[in-house]
Swiss-Prot record:
One of its GO terms (biological process) is translation. Part of the 50S ribosomal subunit. Contacts protein L29, and trigger factor when it is bound to the ribosome. The keyword Iron does not apply. Belongs to the universal ribosomal protein uL23 family. GO terms for molecular function: rRNA binding; structural constituent of ribosome. Keywords: Ribonucleoprotein, Ribosomal protein, RNA-binding, rRNA-binding. This is Large ribosomal subunit protein uL23.
Length: 104
């Protein structure tokens, strides 16, 4: 595998936001995974290092998917929503990320 960049400034820019949706909540309850929207140029190693740095938890694995933006019509013009890269982060047993507690 490639060497993971340990630049803290870069790791702070990898995670854009947590994904809060019905599917993300179902996955979190069933598989103990957390879903994040990540930078388009991020890789699995950077996502793992960023989650461990920001939330002080141990990560077991990371799965990444690229979601293409949908075609949308704006009046008579066709447009496209932005492409999104998501990361499904599996935490080690006993680990948990509580977003409500982190915000306080």
């Amino acid at each position: 595998m490639t060497q993971v960049a340990k630049n803290d400034h870069r790791l702070m820019q990898v995670l854009l936001s947590p994904v809060v949706s019905e599917k993300a909540t179902l996955v979190a309850d069933k598989n103990e995974q957390v879903v994040f929207e990540v930078a388009r140029d991020a890789n699995k190693g950077e996502v793992k290092a960023a989650v461990e740095l920001l939330f002080k938890v141990e990560v077991e694995s990371v799965q990444i998917l690229n979601q293409k933006g949908k075609q949308k019509r704006f009046g008579r013009f066709m447009g496209r929503r932005d492409h999104v890269k998501k990361a499904y982060v599996s935490l080690k047993p006993g680990q948990e990320i509580n977003f409500e507690a982190e915000a306080k």
